[in-house]
């Protein structure tokens, strides 16, 4: 990867960055087609081409986003709407036979009363179920942190990805 991509992701994991810039640096120019860009914005899901090969990408958005209701969502955290979107995307890619690439920089799932009322447990279970049933090739790239249940939800080792790569500054704790 060009040095500018390595510089995009803070080695200490403290700096926000736009996950779309990370994706743009690794996919074929003009091949980016985002899935539900205005929904579940703490995860980015997109149909892309890498080296001419069509794949689906699921990546963390590491900058703060705002929902349609005006609620702020912290970057790197999986919310109920994001988990729902990613589950549907994984199922679609599996149905069409598209390999999946996961770009992890995740602190985990959002917790708390509000998250529970929004259905984080149900939505997280949907994502885990979709991933465990996916038979397409999967590759995981840890670009920043990968912690707790977030590691599993974004194709951690338990889901048997074909390859797991980690950037030099990556941190993994389950």
What are these model-derived regions, one by one?
Residues 1-174:
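Ligand-binding clefts of soluble mixed alpha/beta catalytic domains
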């Amino acid at each position: 990867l060009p040095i500018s991509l390595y510089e995009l992701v803070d080695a200490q994991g403290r700096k926000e960055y736009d996950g779309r810039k990370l994706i743009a640096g690794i996919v074929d120019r003009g091949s980016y087609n985002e899935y539900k860009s205005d929904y579940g914005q703490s995860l980015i899901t997109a149909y892309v081409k890498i080296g001419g090969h069509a794949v689906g990408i699921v990546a963390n958005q590491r900058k703060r986003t705002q929902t349609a209701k005006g609620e702020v969502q912290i970057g790197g955290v999986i919310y109920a709407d994001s988990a729902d979107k990613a589950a549907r995307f994984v199922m679609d890619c599996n149905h069409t036979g598209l390999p999946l690439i996961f770009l992890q920089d995740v602190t985990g799932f959002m917790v708390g009363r509000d998250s529970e009322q929004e259905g984080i447990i149900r939505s997280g279970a949907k994502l885990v179920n979709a991933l465990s049933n996916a038979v397409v090739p999967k590759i995981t790239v840890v670009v920043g942190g990968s912690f707790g249940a977030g590691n599993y939800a974004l194709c951690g080792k338990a889901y048997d990805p074909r390859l797991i790569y980690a950037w030099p500054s990556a941190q993994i704790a389950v």
